[in-house]
């Protein structure tokens, strides 16, 4: 079942934790690619110096953040790596959750080809498929074309995992500082990164 619009409403930190264990799905050329979300970071808008929308900054790139929750915010870093975020909070409150890492589930062969241009890969390469925001976007075929897309769409959405299949019973959720935000002054220390401790696909222990 797709996560309904109400799933993305409410406190961004709570939405971030709720996203753990759910399945990120992207249909590419009719083939389902997906992975279980194992690591996220919350960004809380105007008061968060690490957020693109800090101080209420509103640009063509960030405009989608000011819209309705439950939409995709995709941007480029270093001019080459895409990052996928889920918009949260009410309209006009530019907050979101960065999906940092997933465990591949569906479309494994397509994911391997997207990452390594081959399907015969080593164990180390397999572990490296989707353990970072840029890696998972490349693996799932998420690009700037997906910016602003509703997560109620058939081709890009969050699929809720049934409780009996949820991996939360196997891993402890740990909170810590977000990664690569040295510019963000006191916000560097906010414990707004959430991940499954010990999960092999987490980007950084």
Swiss-Prot record:
Cited Gene3D superfamilies: Methylpurine-DNA glycosylase (MPG)
Residues annotated as signal peptide: none
Pfam short name (any one): Pur_DNA_glyco
Keyword DNA damage: yes
Keywords: DNA damage, DNA repair, Hydrolase
Coiled coil stretches, renumbered: none
Superkingdom: Bacteria
Gene Ontology annotations of biological process type: base-excision repair
One Gene Ontology term of the molecular function aspect: DNA binding
CDD domains assigned: AAG
Entry EC number(s): 3.2.2.-
NCBIfam families, alphabetized: 3mg, PRK00802.1-1, PRK00802.1-3
Family: Belongs to the DNA glycosylase MPG family.
Protein name, entry field: Putative 3-methyladenine DNA glycosylase
Source species of the chain: Bacillus thuringiensis (strain Al Hakam)
Phylogenetic lineage: Bacteria, Bacillati, Bacillota, Bacilli, Bacillales
